[in-house]
Every structure is written in C-alpha cells, then in structure tokens.
A protein has these predicted regions:
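RNase H-like two-metal-ion nuclease catalytic core shared by retroviral integrases
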Residues: 8-13, 98-100, 106-107, 122-142, ...
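An active-site-proximal beta-strand-loop segment
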Residues: 24-63, 69
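Short small-residue beta-strand/loop micro-motif enriched in glycine and branched aliphatics
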Residues: 61-65, 120-123, 146-148
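Active-site beta-loop-alpha junctions of metal-dependent nucleic acid enzymes
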Residues: 66-89
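Short coil/turn segments at beta-strand junctions that form active-site/ligand-binding loops
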Residues: 92
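C-terminal domain-tail junction helix/linker
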Residues: 107-110, 114-118, 140-191
Length: 191
C-alpha cells in the first residue's frame, strides 16, 4: 500500500516561492544542467517512509536520494548538499526544479542552493505536470518496487530502495536514450 498521506505535518512556517524557470522544458544538453526533485511516500510494515530523489534531465539518472522515516528538511537537504559538493567544479550554473513543498521552500534549503549559486525553479501551485518527469518516474519506480522487488516481503527497505535505484540507473533501458540505461548513456556521451 503506497498511497500518499494528506498534508503531513512538517517543521517551519517559512515558505519561499520561486518562478517556474524550467517551464516544462524537460531536456538538458549535458549532465548536471537541470535537476528535478520530489518526495514520495512509501508504506512499509505499517509505517510511512519518505523518499526524496534528484533526477538529472540529461539522462533521467537518479543522481542522489534519501530515504527516511522522518518528513523533515534534512530529507531533501542531505542529497542536495552531496550533489552540490560533487558538482563544485561544474563551470555552468545548475538549475534545481521542485514543487512548492515545505522542504523545498524552507529557508534552509533555499539558502543551501543560493550558497552554491544554484538557480531555483518551482512548479506552479497544484500543477504536478510542471514536474512531470519525476512524478512519472515515481509511478514506474513504485511499480517495479512492488512487482520486481516485492518490497513488502523485505525487512530492509533501504536495501530494496538501493537495488531499485540501481536497476533504473544501470539496467533498465530507456527509449529516449537509444535503448540504453541512464549511466551507460552518460558515459558513452562523455567519451
């Protein structure tokens, strides 16, 4: 059972809003140019868990993610910081696009992105199509989690999430990537 909870309680009342700069242009010419992110909910063994993913629009690779049983700012900030630390040497600016969720609009998250000179973009309120790539990914991700990995039988949810991300990044071919998995496509484009 993986239905979203309505309005989970989170800390912080600040709510920054940013323009929809991505504007449904879900194509990137190179890695680390446009990153989309969102959080999904997974019920496992009677308890809600939260998965934040960051997806590179160049090749639809999940470049980082965080699984937690706590729906707080660290859920989205930990992977964002890891990505930005790795990308310090990137010459061009990176765009991060999200919905207007509390974590993505918090002062802590917005300040983190500013400190790395990231362009922040947000979907319009109530418009999930503005972040369609990650929304669609989560649908496929949960289908594979259910059917292929049968996550409900496993005691270690983190291990199953890791295996599912590995499957999407290294094994599952994508039509838009000439029938290659995301990591293989990225490596071949760099060669």
């Amino acid at each position: 059972y993986m239905r979203k909870q309505k309005n989970p309680q989170t800390e912080g009342s600040e709510h920054n809003r940013y323009a929809n700069i991505l504007n449904r242009e879900f194509y990137a010419q190179k890695p680390m140019q446009k990153i989309v992110t969102d959080v999904t909910y997974i019920k496992h063994k009677g308890k809600w868990h939260y998965l934040a993913c960051y997806l590179d629009l160049f090749n639809n690779e999940i470049i980082d993610y965080e699984l937690s049983d706590t729906f707080d700012n660290f859920l989205v900030m930990k992977p964002a910081k890891r990505i930005l630390e790795k990308a310090k040497s990137t010459e061009s600016q990176i765009l991060f696009h999200s919905d207007q969720g509390v974590q993505y609009s918090s002062a802590g998250y917005c300040n983190l992105l500013k400190s790395y000179n990231v362009i922040q973009s947000m979907s319009r309120a109530g418009t999930p199509r503005d972040n369609a790539v990650i929304e669609s990914f989560f649908g496929r991700f949960k289908d594979v989690l259910r059917s292929h990995f049968q996550y409900w039988k496993c005691d270690d949810l983190q291990k199953v999430i890791d295996e599912t991300v590995h499957y999407f990044n290294y094994i599952k071919p994508m039509r838009k990537l000439k029938r290659k998995p995301p990591v293989q496509y990225r490596l071949e484009q760099a060669a």
